[in-house]
């Protein structure tokens, strides 16, 4: 439900090639922030391989499910991505903004962002000893990752995974409670920790 249609994806890629365009990237979603839907990541990865395209996963919300032993199977195919975006300020319980991009090959970031002005030569890095400005757009930046590191040190991934699993259960409980009531409609069923519902009493329009 609410997933990418991979048949239409194949058709769109073929149509672009027919026009002489060069499709180069597909972005799959690992848990939308409105319905919790997860795209068929393994299938999308296969399509990307067939067409020599970059496969990025928007895991801003749902990538945190990887910390849940019970539910991480829902993100099967994540390991096939070339890059993943992941917001710790969504489901890793951090304050805004704390997010990350994970890449399979750091050289892609380094060769895209590495700069070598004269005033930085005294702290020049390389692929073995990376300076963060060599793998992103910012030079001076706040220590956004420190709060996540501290949280992981204090709570650990097991406790965070349990909290994520509790979020799944809360969504299911809410859905079951609403289904027992009159005039309430489930718009999208409980997925991850998301549930959409509305009040549908007679005489009321949308």
PLM regions and their residue ranges:
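Conserved PLP-enzyme active-site core in the AAT-like
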Residues: 1-110
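Active-site C-terminal subdomain of aminotransferase-like
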Residues: 24, 32, 51, 76-179
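Surface-exposed helix-capping loop/turn segments at secondary-structure junctions
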Residues: 178-187
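Conserved PLP-binding catalytic core of the aspartate aminotransferase-like
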Residues: 186-206
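Histidine- and/or cysteine-centered catalytic micro-motif in compact active-site loops
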Residues: 60, 106, 151-155, 191, ...
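Short, ordered beta-strand-loop transition motifs
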Residues: 1, 124-125, 189-190
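Short, glycine- and charge-enriched coil/turn segments that flank and shape catalytic ligand pockets
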Residues: 18-19, 128-129, 201-206
């Amino acid at each position: 439900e609410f997933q990418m249609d991979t048949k239409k994806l194949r058709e769109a890629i073929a149509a672009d090639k027919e026009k002489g365009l060069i499709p180069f990237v597909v972005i799959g979603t690992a848990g939308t922030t409105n319905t919790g839907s997860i795209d068929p990541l393994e299938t999308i990865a296969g399509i990307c391989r067939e067409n020599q395209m970059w496969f990025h996963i928007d895991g801003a919300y749902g990538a945190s499910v990887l910390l849940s032993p019970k539910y991480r199977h829902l993100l099967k195919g994540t390991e096939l991505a070339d890059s993943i975006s992941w917001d710790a300020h969504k489901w890793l319980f951090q304050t805004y903004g704390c997010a990350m991009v994970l890449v399979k090959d750091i050289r892609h970031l380094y060769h895209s962002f590495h700069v070598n002005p004269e005033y930085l030569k005294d702290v020049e890095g390389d692929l073995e000893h990376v300076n963060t400005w060599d793998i992103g757009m910012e030079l001076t930046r706040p220590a956004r990752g420190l709060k996540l590191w501290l949280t992981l040190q204090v709570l650990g991934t097991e406790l965070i995974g349990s909290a994520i699993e509790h979020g799944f259960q809360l969504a299911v409980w809410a859905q079951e409670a609403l289904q027992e009531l009159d005039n309430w409609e489930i718009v999208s069923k409980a997925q991850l920790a998301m549930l959409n519902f509305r009040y549908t009493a007679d005489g009321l329009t949308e």
